[in-house]
């Protein structure tokens, strides 16, 4: 049995909640690794790399397992999954000489394995290197056996009697979901059989130039956690553990395992080592409910306690079994403790009671809510559109104007408005939208206004559906004089006042989206930054679509992708609530593609807001103090 480094490795990396994406958890173990150390065994760790734009980028690294050729890693990688993308992964195993979690030039490469992430039969797994035998009929009727297997390129590369081909690139129409077919070809005739796709994959490690790393293998277990509805925070301590050291006290650490359906043990978490202590208090840790018990509270769990040895020969102290259901009940009753039992001692000694006691010091269960949870719980999306009527758009009567109404083709304002609005209206029960304008002289006095209703009804600026907004926009154009400047802070502040009233209710009932359509950089940048920072604390998102061919470089500062937006006074935004999209980059895209790009960040922003406020979906009726919203689709 191997332990990790003296610092524990979390089973759910990163903070919670996570961003909105389908999630796959990857667990790693290796067998028969090469031994690069002359006096001791290798100290392995695994780096996970993901291919982005043709380059391999390291996204994480496991802990170091000291002095082990058969490591089981506690670190769990959580990978975002996108159905429409080919996501290439590479696992590299090193004999580590630097600090845990960091690469170092002196690290010895022990082998690697490449694969892709896939979704057959609605189960997450790794599509790995496949070897397909092919009998090719030679010119004299002689048959030569060839093998097709995964490589980086989609084209064939001949190496001796082998062809190298990535399985994903075969694009075979007969490859059914949930299975991989192996086919043998002879003289144009085919026969095949199925290998049922599994979530556990074991493959050999390869050195440079494709050489096998001895008998070394890596096992990757992939698990879908998209349906995960919570995470658990646990804290353990122990008392009166057996002393396994002659001249000092034990150095205990604890391992928590889940018992799988095949009765095999899956490592969930490994604590840090507490030095020279028979009454250790281990640091609290978080694991997803899926990782802990596959979201089955009655699934058996097993805890093992060890005395750490730097050479990897850890001394077994004891163990106990439980379930998450039992842990919750015992903790509520104040009796969450278990005898730490060594079965060998129990069998040999009649008077033996235990090798110490393990106590569950703290248990917190946090529900995790998704964007759909809030929508299905009754949260309404209120949509407001603000249209730029400044003179820089050009005279609407001129066909070169961005506001020109062509009877045969919508202008850019209408394209953006309809594409985004048709999506938003599906989340609003009354289908009524506020429609505002800015930068124009309006009747009757023709004074410049940066906040006017385009239906010219200041008491009710809402229109019936997106078609009502389109009609109000078309009717408004001949009645106003395009002017300036491009001030948007007044409209942001107006919507923010409505959102502030909603915030005071303490319910997840209304969320506000402000769509600003403009042809240039805003003039009141300082006031706009101030208004956005204030709005970041409210149930509100802002989407800015730049129409026309102006230089929108300065607008990127409002989108917090390059850093936290700050007000002129230096106050940071609580959340990134602004998405800026230049329309010219999407003008030839379909309405669906435009809407997808423009609205991509909204689900995440909705969940982040309610997560910060600790508000559950309304229909669930969970007390706010118990809610821990997160983002799992």
Swiss-Prot record:
Domain VWFA residue range list: 382-581
Pfam families in alphabetical order: C2, Copine
Gene3D superfamilies assigned to the protein according to its UniProt record, in alphabetical order: C2 domain, von Willebrand factor, type A domain
Swiss-Prot/TrEMBL cofactor(s): Ca(2+)
Domain C2 positions: 2-133, 212-339
CDD domains in the cross-refs: C2A_Copine, C2B_Copine, vWA_copine_like
Keywords: Calcium, Cell membrane, Cytoplasm, Membrane, Metal-binding, Nucleus, Repeat
Subcellular location: Cytoplasm; Nucleus; Cell membrane
BP term (GO), one: lipid metabolic process
GO molecular function, a single term: calcium-dependent phospholipid binding
Residue intervals passing through the bilayer: none
Binding annotation for Ca(2+) 2: 245, 307, 309, 315
Expression by tissue: Expressed in the brain, testis, thymus and small intestine.
One GO location term (cellular component): cytoplasm
Annotated residues for binding of Ca(2+) 1: 245, 251, 307, 309
The keyword Kinase is annotated on this UniProt entry: no
Function according to Swiss-Prot or TrEMBL: Calcium-dependent phospholipid-binding protein that may play a role in calcium-mediated intracellular processes.
Domain remark from Swiss-Prot or TrEMBL: The C2 domain 1 is not necessary for calcium-mediated translocation and association to the plasma membrane. The C2 domain 2 is necessary for calcium-mediated translocation and association to the plasma membrane.
Family affiliation: Belongs to the copine family.
Name this protein carries in UniProt: Copine-7
Species this protein is from: Homo sapiens (Human)
Highest classification ranks of the organism: Eukaryota, Metazoa, Chordata, Craniata, Vertebrata
């Amino acid at each position: 049995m191997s332990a990790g480094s003296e610092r524990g490795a979390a089973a759910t990396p990163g903070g919670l909640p996570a961003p909105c994406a389908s999630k796959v958890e990857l667990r790693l173990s290796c067998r028969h690794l090469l031994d690069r150390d002359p006096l001791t065994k290798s100290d392995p760790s695994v780096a996970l790399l993901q291919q982005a734009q043709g380059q391999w980028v390291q996204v994480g690294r496991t802990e170091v397992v000291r002095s082990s050729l058969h490591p089981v890693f506690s670190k769990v990688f959580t990978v975002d999954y996108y159905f429409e993308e080919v996501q290439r992964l590479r696992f590299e195993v090193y004999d580590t000489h630097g600090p845990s979690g960091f690469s170092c030039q002196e690290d010895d490469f022990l082998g690697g394995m490449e694969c892709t992430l896939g979704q057959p039969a609605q189960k997450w797994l790794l599509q790995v290197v496949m070897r397909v035998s092919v009998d090719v009929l030679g010119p004299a009727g002689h048959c030569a056996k060839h093998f097709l297997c995964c490589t980086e390129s989609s084209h064939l590369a001949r190496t001796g009697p082998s062809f190298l081909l990535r399985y994903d690139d075969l694009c075979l129409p007969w490859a059914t979901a949930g299975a991989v077919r192996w086919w043998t070809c002879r003289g144009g005739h085919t026969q095949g059989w199925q290998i049922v796709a599994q979530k556990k994959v074991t493959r050999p490690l390869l050195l440079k130039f494709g050489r096998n790393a001895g008998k070394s293998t890596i096992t990757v277990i992939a698990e879908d956690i998209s349906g995960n509805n919570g995470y658990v925070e646990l804290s353990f301590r122990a008392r009166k553990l057996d002393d396994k050291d002659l001249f000092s006290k034990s150095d205990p650490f604890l391992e928590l395992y889940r018992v799988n359906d095949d009765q095999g043990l899956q490592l969930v978490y490994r604590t840090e080592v507490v030095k020279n202590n028979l009454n250790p208090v281990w640091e609290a840790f978080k694991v997803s409910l899926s990782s802990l018990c596959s979201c089955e509270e009655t699934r058996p769990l097993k805890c093992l306690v060890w005395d750490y040895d730097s050479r990897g020969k850890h001394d077994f102290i004891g163990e106990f079994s439980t379930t998450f259901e039992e842990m919750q009940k015992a903790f509520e009753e104040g009796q969450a403790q278990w005898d730490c039992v060594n079965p060998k001692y129990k069998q040999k000694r009649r008077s033996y009671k235990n090798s110490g006691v393990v106590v569950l010091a703290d248990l917190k269960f946090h529900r995790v809510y998704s964007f759909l949870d809030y929508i299905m719980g009754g949260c309404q999306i209120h949509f407001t559109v603000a249209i730029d009527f400044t003179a820089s758009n050009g005279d609407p009567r001129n066909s070169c104007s961005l506001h020109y109404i062509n009877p045969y083709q919508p202008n850019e304002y209408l394209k953006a408005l309809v594409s985004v609005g048709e999506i938003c209206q599906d989340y609003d029960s009354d289908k009524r939208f506020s429609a505002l304008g800015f930068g124009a002289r309006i009747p009757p006095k023709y004074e410049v206004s940066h906040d006017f209703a385009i239906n010219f009804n200041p008491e009710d600026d809402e229109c019936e559906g997106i078609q009502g907004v389109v009609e109000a926009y078309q009717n408004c154009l001949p009645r106003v004089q395009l002017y300036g400047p491009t001030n948007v802070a007044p409209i942001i502040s107006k919507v923010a006042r409505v959102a502030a009233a909603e915030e005071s209710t303490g319910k997840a009932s209304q969320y506000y989206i402000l769509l600003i359509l403009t042809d240039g950089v805003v003039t009141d940048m300082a006031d706009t930054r101030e208004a956005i920072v204030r709005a970041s604390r409210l149930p509100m998102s802002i989407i800015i679509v730049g129409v026309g061919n102006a230089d929108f470089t300065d607008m990127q500062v409002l989108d917090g992708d390059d850093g936290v937006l700050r007000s002129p006074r230096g106050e940071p935004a609580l959340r990134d609530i602004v998405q800026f999209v230049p329309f010219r980059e999407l003008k030839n895209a379909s309405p669906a593609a435009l809407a997808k790009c423009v609205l991509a960040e909204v689900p995440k922003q909705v969940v982040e807001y309610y997560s910060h406020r600790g508000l559950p979906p309304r229909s669930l009726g969970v007390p706010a103090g118990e809610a821990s919203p997160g983002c799992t689709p």
